[in-house]
Amino acid sequence: MGQSVVILGTQWGDEGKGKIVDLLTDKAQFVVRYQGGHNAGHTLVIDGKKTVLHLIPSGILRDNCKCIIGNGVVLAPDALLKEMNELESSGYPVRDRLFLSEACPLILPYHVALDKARELARGNKAIGTTGRGIGPAYEDKVARRGLRVGDLFNMDTFAEKLKEVMTYHNFQLTQFYGVEAVSYEDVLAAVKEYASLLISMVVDVTEMLDQARKRGDKIMFEGAQGTLLDIDHGTYPYVTSSNTTAGGVATGSGYGPRFVEYVLGIAKAYTTRVGGGPFPTELFDDVGENLCARGHEYGATTGRKRRCGWFDAVAMKRAIQINSISGFCLTKLDVLDGLDEVKICIGYKGEDGTVRDVPPMAADGYDLVTPVYESMPGWKENTFGVKSIADLPQAAINYIHRIEAITGVPIDIISTGPDRDETMILRHPFAD
């Protein structure tokens, strides 16, 4: 608990981070996105009205918050402008409260074309990307050929750099993937349309956050996707292209790692995954279908159906280790209502019969393990919207306590519905 708080997903994304960020920003002065792009989909429900944010930090719905998009985020200008316009048409002021790092890499149309062409070429080995150019933009960043927000300050130089990088990428598109080239003239014209707006939002993010810290302002760092999709620590190669873990906060925003005081890990009471990749506890029976239906498990960004399974404490152990989780927020507890029994995966059994309590490092290793479960009685009572832990059925309380015991991490927040007030805060991350 403290002044600087990180909120991130501990599973394969879609854990319910957006709602929790929005809920806790009543005490924050700054909310910072530090990785990912508009492949994220954070769904918020306020007074029954649903808002889906893909790029702008969820704190934008709070008048007291300034929102920052840090250098670790790959920025799609067209997506940003669309989101800004939608928010402003709904009555939320954006332009005077949203700030950008000039080091943000730009996602441009050729990145999207490359992303789609590659997924198509992979066929049945497709990774399951959102097709929004995230990976190719990060590739350009690492290869030091990417264009950044700061390049927009000099359009003559920008045009030269754009010509060079598009010659390179259009060669790939036409000669290797056999698809049409992207028009240089069209891309440059589009950039000129929004360049001045983006420039007007540029600040020195490191300095802004450091001054905020020294004033005693409360700062929240909003993660996107989930720990198990981290480019280094996730189920590689079925991962995203950024560091979704707590270490990404420092590198993706320029904020000193020693100043982070609390890391809140968001976890569903079960597990979901969208797209390809290993998923040891995945259910292919009626229970899995029930979780999908009751949990409305369809991606906020792609609309794809999510795969559903039991809570995986083995994978969670790795998330705790990597992120130094201070406490959990357990979401969608109500989705488990009505089940005769609930299960927690407590180990992975190998082909030789040995049981391990840590996951493999890469996707291939999951082919050799099967989950070992601990079963507990379910509950028939309705927990949707319950606002006090004392009002939960005893079986649900037992399930919560068992997760705490297995993981060694306290559950500080419990969510029983999509709205702000359908939440139990047992220990506030920003509490003094």
Curated annotation (Swiss-Prot):
Which Gene3D superfamilies does the entry mention? Adenylosuccinate Synthetase, subunit A, domain 1, Adenylosuccinate Synthetase, subunit A, domain 2, Adenylosuccinate Synthetase, subunit A, domain 3
Q: What residues does IMP bind to?
A: D14, E15, G16, K17, N39, A40, G41, H42, T130, R144, Q225, T240, R304
The UniProt record gives the binding positions of substrate as A300, T301, T302, G303, R304, K305, R306
Q: Which SMART domains match?
A: Adenylsucc_synt
Give the chief site where it resides. Answer: cytoplasm
Q: Which InterPro entries match?
A: Adenylosuccin_syn_GTP-bd, Adenylosuccin_syn_Lys_AS, Adenylosuccinate_synth_dom1, Adenylosuccinate_synth_dom2, Adenylosuccinate_synth_dom3, Adenylosuccinate_synthetase, P-loop_NTPase
The terms under GO molecular function for this entry are: adenylosuccinate synthase activity; GTP binding; magnesium ion binding
Biological processes annotated in GO: 'de novo' AMP biosynthetic process; IMP metabolic process
Please name the pathway. Answer: Purine metabolism; AMP biosynthesis via de novo pathway; AMP from IMP: step 1/2
* Family statement drawn from the similarity comment of this UniProt entry: Belongs to the adenylosuccinate synthetase family.
Q: What biological function has been recorded for the protein in this entry?
A: Plays an important role in the de novo pathway of purine nucleotide biosynthesis. Catalyzes the first committed step in the biosynthesis of AMP from IMP.
Q: What is this protein called?
A: Adenylosuccinate synthetase
**Which gene specifies this protein's sequence?**
purA
